[in-house]
């Protein structure tokens, strides 16, 4: 598989426009630098050194840009539309895919050359340079459903160890439900194995006038941050995006949106960086997430 490049104008949004810059009529190739730069703070005396903090920076990426229109007029339009699509957004996202990985980088346009179209069809051959906002990260889609109590079935609930208990008897080969958890939400937890630096989520609240959201626990089970909203009316769903460059906390009832930032429980929202541990749903029937995990070098 030849490496593939695509540009997303709004990766987290429903209006995302995907530009295929590998196989489309505007193509990017020969990137100048997909790596990184590391600055090491080292103190030395008489050849003996002490290693301090390392700082990683991401250099600009420069691509060669080529248009493949059928005519001079089409090539002008391709060039114009491509640049305007990028300029119309605060930043865009580069998708970089090979046979062994698929990663993303958030970029801001820094420079693009503009010469004259050449050849029979008026093709443009230019250079385009991007400043790096965040590079690289993985992007995953996850869905979580709340665990609920089972329905009571006469003679077939709360079976323990295959023995009769309280009038209920275990029968081999029969399916049983379990019922009676007064704090069923404590079972709606999921392990987080790797750090998440930002995520976009759609949350589906259950009860009105009851805090709704998600909380995050460390390895010892202690809450270190939570995104929880206190609303009078239950929302159809809550849209959140913790990316510092594209932050959103928005409730939706039908086609009406509401800014939920003022009703967030700020005492519990301590950090946007999600660590290894667990996540728990609070007053939610379901949650859908698009999560981003950092990968400095690929």
Curated annotation (Swiss-Prot):
The keyword Transmembrane helix does not apply. GO terms for biological process: symbiont genome ejection through host cell envelope, long flexible tail mechanism. Signal peptide: none annotated. Its main location: virion. The keyword Acetylation does not apply. Keywords: Viral genome ejection through host cell envelope, Viral long flexible tail ejection system, Viral penetration into host cytoplasm, Viral tail protein, Virion, Virus entry into host cell. It holds the Pfam family Dit_C. Disulfide bonds: none annotated. It is found in: Virion. It comes from the Viruses. GO terms for cellular component: virus tail. Belongs to the skunalikevirus distal tail protein family. Forms the distal part of the tail. Self-associates as two rings organized back to back, with a central channel allowing DNA ejection. Homohexamer. Interacts with the receptor binding protein. This is Distal tail protein. It comes from Lactococcus phage SK1.
């Amino acid at each position: 598989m030849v490496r593939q490049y695509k540009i997303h104008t709004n990766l987290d949004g429903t209006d995302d426009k995907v530009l295929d810059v590998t196989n489309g009529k505007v193509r990017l190739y020969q990137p100048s630098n997909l790596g990184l730069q590391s600055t090491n703070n080292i103190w030395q005396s008489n050849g003996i050194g002490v290693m301090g903090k390392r700082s990683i920076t991401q250099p600009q990426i420069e691509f060669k840009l080529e248009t493949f229109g059928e005519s001079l007029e089409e090539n002008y339009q391709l060039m114009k539309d491509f640049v305007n699509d990028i300029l119309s957004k605060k930043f865009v996202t580069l998708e970089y895919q090979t046979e062994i990985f698929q990663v993303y980088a958030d970029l801001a346009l820094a420079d693009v050359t503009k010469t004259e179209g050449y050849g029979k069809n008026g093709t443009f051959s230019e250079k385009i340079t991007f400043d790096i906002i965040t590079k690289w990260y993985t992007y995953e889609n996850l869905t979580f459903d709340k665990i609920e109590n089972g329905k009571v079935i006469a003679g077939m609930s709360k079976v323990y160890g295959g023995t009769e208990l309280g009038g209920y008897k275990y029968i081999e080969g029969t399916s049983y439900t379990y019922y009676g958890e007064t704090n069923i939400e404590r079972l709606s937890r999921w392990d987080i194995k790797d750090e998440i630096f930002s995520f976009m989520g759609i949350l589906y609240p259950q009860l009105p006038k009851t805090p709704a959201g998600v909380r995050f626990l460390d390895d010892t089970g202690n809450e270190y941050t939570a995104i929880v909203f206190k609303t009078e009316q239950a929302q159809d769903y809550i849209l959140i995006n913790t990316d510092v460059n594209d932050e959103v906390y928005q409730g939706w009832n039908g086609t009406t949106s509401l800014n939920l930032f003022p009703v967030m429980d700020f005492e519990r929202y301590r950090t946007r960086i999600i660590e290894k541990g667990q996540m728990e749903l609070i007053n939610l029937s379901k949650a859908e997430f698009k999560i981003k995990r950092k990968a400095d070098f690929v």
